[in-house]
Amino acid sequence: MAVSKLTLAATSGKSCKILLGLRLLAFSATLSAAIVMGLNKETKTFIVGKVGNTPIQATFTAKFDHTPAFVFFVVANAMVSFHNLLMIALQIFGGKMEFTGFRLLSVAILDMLNVTLISAAANAAAFMAEVGKNGNKHARWDKICDRFATYCDHGAGALIAAFAGVILMLIISAASISRLVQPNKCCSTTASPSVVP
């Protein structure tokens, strides 16, 4: 019986470190997606016409906040980053606080809500990126990526980071749900093995 408790404590410590690593990766992915998209801006000057031989120039700026889907993308990724930062802080600095009962259920629910939030934001931004890249002939929306290549490249990088965050949050959410079945599987990283029954 004592050997099984030690084995369970060792497994618990390993699963805690894996979950902490996954949360750190998800935090990094979602934060980088929010920062890259939030700073995404490109300004170019184009010739829009001619008066005689004199070209008429106009300056246009492509910014993330010109599209509501990209604003939603930045806000959602920032919220998921903040959630993961709080969970990391609780796991590292939580002392001997056990995640059981309502606390465990609330963490699992928050993880599932964050998966939904970041998935919706990434898909909305991916749709708008597709319109920006290829346009929409039926709606007569012109593509812009042939004119604002850097803007589109930065947006693509943010989307890649966000979809990596979606995958990581799915794994974290599955781990949170599995902890509902085995509540003492992962407590704080600083908790002693004697906490595990």
From Swiss-Prot:
Residues where N-acetylalanine is found: A2
This protein's UniProt keywords: Acetylation, Cell membrane, Membrane, Transmembrane, Transmembrane helix
Localisation: Cell membrane
Intervals, Cytoplasmic compartment: 2-17, 91-106, 178-197
InterPro entries xrefs: CASP/CASPL, CASP_dom, CASPL
Topological category with respect to the lipid bilayer: Multi-pass membrane protein
Pfam families reported in the protein's UniProt record: CASP_dom
GO terms under cellular component: plasma membrane
Transmembrane feature ranges: 18-38, 70-90, 107-127, 157-177
Coiled-coil region(s): none
Ranges facing Extracellular side: 39-69, 128-156
Oligomeric and partner information: Homodimer and heterodimers.
The family this protein is said to belong to: Belongs to the Casparian strip membrane proteins (CASP) family.
PANTHER family, alphabetized: CASP-LIKE PROTEIN 1U1
Protein name as annotated: CASP-like protein 1B1
Species assigned in the record: Arabidopsis thaliana (Mouse-ear cress)
Phylogenetic lineage: Eukaryota, Viridiplantae, Streptophyta, Embryophyta, Tracheophyta
